[in-house]
Amino acid sequence: MTPEHLPTEQYEAQLAEKVARLQSMMAPFSGLVPEVFRSPVSHYRMRAEFRLWHDGDDLYHIMFDQQTKSRIRVDTFPAASQLINTLMKAMIAGVRDNHALRHKLFQMDYLTTLSNQAVVSLLYHKKLDEEWREAATALRDALRAQGLNVHLIGRATKTKIELDQDYIDERLPVAGKEMIYRQVENSFTQPNAAMNIQMLEWALEVTKDSKGDLLELYCGNGNFSLALARNFNRVLATEIAKPSVAAAQYNIAANHIDNVQIIRMAAEEFTQAMNGVREFNRLQGIDLKGYQCETIFVDPPRSGLDSETEKMVQAYPRILYISCNPETLCKNLETLSQTHTVSRLALFDQFPYTHHMECGVLLTAR
């Protein structure tokens, strides 16, 4: 695979290899055959980052070969959304001959939505001034005149210039209901929107007969907690990143959801609060004991759950675990399987043509 060529004819084979690998990894904990969710074979990534290469008068996007570290010119990127591909051409055309925009530019980051909105961030090794702002505003207006719904952001050391805003609003059809998600530049969002829809619908399906409340750790912009709110009396969710918490609060209001409470704190801190080890001012006015959480949802970073959080989640009758790293999932399952059994297993092909796997498990108490 190269940045400009996807081996789409190999999609089925690479997916079958992942299914076999996941089943083998999960064998000590479950004999289940994974439920498999396929990705679109191209144009599935909603975000992408590229370095810029200045080659005389020419300017183009590049990526680096992971093995050789050699640079690869990238004029089209079929893994990315059609909108990113359109913007890649338009941005190069708009920047190449403009000194204020091109000088010391070293990277462009693209974030797009299925609703055809985009944020493009331009990263510089220089101070950004009024000349840059005027040139960027003219470029933005020219792009919009071409029918592109785009926002531009300039970044340099300790500097961030938003011409309008640093977010876009995604609209996803999830189990018969449109969900609105504000996505903030430079914050985590699910990269494969089509796969995200399938993950949300799978999570809804496996929790459809839930009782009581839901606790979610690492909720981000509320991606899962807001979709799952319809299956629970109440949802209590934690997140540490300020921009993600602000986006989650917006998303709660935009989706007219009244049974979700977001707390800004780390999972480790929340564990301490639940266990009565520490008190936190951020929890004033929130009656943790009043929640009847029968289900806990975790979508941890690649490192998985720490040992204290492992112990904490074992106290819940049902654990819904979405993992972007099956190796750390299996490490966590060595502990969790002492008290819970795997009742559902899913493979989400979030990153086609790579070795990366995303998977989901539902664990029920023995």
UniProtKB/Swiss-Prot annotation:
It is an enzyme of class 2 (transferase). NCBIfam families: trmA_only. This is tRNA/tmRNA (uracil-C(5))-methyltransferase. It comes from Salmonella heidelberg (strain SL476). GO terms for biological process: tRNA methylation. It catalyses: uridine(54) in tRNA + S-adenosyl-L-methionine = 5-methyluridine(54) in tRNA + S-adenosyl-L-homocysteine + H(+); uridine(341) in tmRNA + S-adenosyl-L-methionine = 5-methyluridine(341) in tmRNA + S-adenosyl-L-homocysteine + H(+). The active site is at 324 (nucleophile), 358 (proton acceptor). PROSITE patterns: SAM_MT_RNA_M5U (PS51687), TRMA_1 (PS01230), TRMA_2 (PS01231). Disulfide bonds: none annotated. Its EC number is 2.1.1.-, 2.1.1.35. It comes from the Bacteria. Dual-specificity methyltransferase that catalyzes the formation of 5-methyluridine at position 54 (m5U54) in all tRNAs, and that of position 341 (m5U341) in tmRNA (transfer-mRNA). S-adenosyl-L-methionine binds at residues 190, 218, 223, 239, 299. One of its GO terms (cellular component) is cytosol. Pfam families: tRNA_U5-meth_tr (PF05958). Belongs to the class I-like SAM-binding methyltransferase superfamily. RNA M5U methyltransferase family. TrmA subfamily. GO terms for molecular function: rRNA binding; tRNA (uracil(54)-C5)-methyltransferase activity, S-adenosyl methionine-dependent; tRNA binding.
